[in-house]
């Protein structure tokens, strides 16, 4: 009787979301749907961003493009890494044992998310320097220093999470879709505090400090410009139109950055601290907060890139190039279509 019961339990796959399991399909349906959906979204979104940067050379003239492309590649690798738990949930055999697979997956995703988060902080620092020191900006921020900064971001992110292989504790809940990670690999309060103090807290403080000061400086500049325009209009006797306040645009960017960052990451960080300090875990909470934070891999480049008019033009060129290639292929297959001798407009990628 006991052996039969054990056999029935062992036939059921391990599911963090127990209510997502269906007997008919014999896998964790809800987990698979969520992870596969986010994987497709992250991969496709960041591939588009990378292609647009290759399609619009003007984007590469901006220093922030170095960090945005770093974010795009890091987030793309996050999406590719998420294929591993997707295949595991669909009962595909793992190349190595489950314990090593989930440790490597948790470490890789943690490092990639750290690179993405550090790039966000570096973008805010770059914009802060551009506004506070516009005359010396080109001498302070050089391509060589940007490449060095990106290298240090990857190195620092790797070093922060490397102790997870030396029994310091679990770096996060990314690998908890594997049973060994969820049940046998536990968090440590000291290692969790170390990660928060070395990564999450500094990144949040830098973003808040820099964008708050950017907003304040731009608001002061707008006020000065409005006063000068009013003084000039009163002296000339003409009522000139006051230009639209540019601080509104900065306020919206500030709102998007801070709100998305905290909405997606704060629940994960809070649960990470509470679970490691109290020892009480909740599988539903860990899954929800973890994949909510991972979804930021899709939001990062969307927030920064879609706010750029040059990026939007590059996206139009990319879509135009795809339509042109489809049209030219259709024309080549149709012998009755008159072919134009002029060059095709589009983006050569």
Swiss-Prot record:
It holds the Pfam family 7tm_1. One of its GO terms (molecular function) is G protein-coupled receptor activity. GO terms for biological process: G protein-coupled receptor signaling pathway; glucose homeostasis; insulin receptor signaling pathway; negative regulation of insulin receptor signaling pathway; positive regulation of multicellular organism growth. It is a multi-pass membrane protein. CDD domains: 7tm_classA_rhodopsin-like (cd00637). The keyword Membrane applies. Not detected in the brain regions thalamus, putamen, caudate, frontal cortex, pons, hypothalamus, hippocampus. It is found in: Cell membrane. Residues 1-32, 97-104, 169-191, 274-283 are extracellular. Glycans are attached at residues 2, 8. InterPro entries: GPCR_Rhodpsn (IPR000276), GPCR_Rhodpsn_7TM (IPR017452), TAAR (IPR050569). The keyword ATP-binding does not apply. Signal peptide: none annotated. Disulfide bonds: none annotated. Keywords: Cell membrane, G-protein coupled receptor, Glycoprotein, Membrane, Receptor, Transducer, Transmembrane, Transmembrane helix. One of its GO terms (cellular component) is plasma membrane. The chain crosses the membrane at residues 33-53, 76-96, 105-125, 148-168, 192-212, 253-273, 284-304. Residues 54-75, 126-147, 213-252, 305-349 are cytoplasmic. PANTHER family: G-PROTEIN COUPLED RECEPTOR 21-RELATED (PTHR24249:SF384), HISTAMINE RECEPTOR-RELATED G-PROTEIN COUPLED RECEPTOR (PTHR24249). Orphan receptor. Belongs to the G-protein coupled receptor 1 family. This is Probable G-protein coupled receptor 21. The lineage of its organism: Eukaryota, Metazoa, Chordata, Craniata, Vertebrata. The gene is GPR21.
